[in-house]
Amino acid sequence: MKAFILCCSFLFSFLQYAAAQQDFIYGGDIQDIEVVGKQKYDRLVSKGARMPIAEVSFEEGSKLKFLGSVVECSAPFEVSKFSLTVHRCLAERAIFKLTFRKIEADGTHQELLETPLLFSMNQSAEKAEYYVTPEENITLAPGTYYIGITLLDATGDEQKVLFPMYVKKSFVIEKDSSELQPVSYNIGLSVAGRKIK
């Protein structure tokens, strides 16, 4: 009984913390092969443990805050697609931007994509899966990378998009800053592709 009470207390404390920090999201590591139809993908993803009921919100205050993971690539990796789950899009229309940044030995990082990788979603009260295929060829050489997402723009009376919450070490880059700020949860954004041997 005591263990149950402690567990509930921890969950309540975590959800209170998450509610205060709900702008912050995402996570990923190279994982096992995923088979989609006849196509095989290596997944650059680690969603972490799903938090029941809890959600992460992107809204007006989170615009231009990048939220993502630091990923180690031991071999060249060709990115094929991104996927994520959205619980509800309360905005009439929301535009998101994905970023790939190479992290140098001194901690500095630069955007790798010449063309911004954007995707949009329209207002919906239903849970939906989104898949994004980049037009630009994205091949990551061995090294350390930051992969993140930000809300670029939203329209409508309630400019908010809600995602499922996962427990996972992630990082935030504030607007006009280069510092990687650690946070403890994400939305489970997946990056799939293939290792180049």
State each model region's role:
Residues 1-4:
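Positively charged n-region of N-terminal signal peptides that target proteins for export
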Residues 111-123:
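Solvent-exposed serine/threonine-rich low-complexity stretches and specific carbohydrate-binding patches
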Residues 18-22:
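Boundary at the C-terminal end of the N-terminal hydrophobic targeting segment
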Residues 104-107, 135-144:
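A short, structured loop/turn motif at beta-sheet edges
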Residues 126-137:
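Exposed aromatic-hydrophobic patches
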Residues 24-103, 144, 150-197:
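Beta-sheet-rich sandwich/jelly-roll-like modules and their strand-loop junctions
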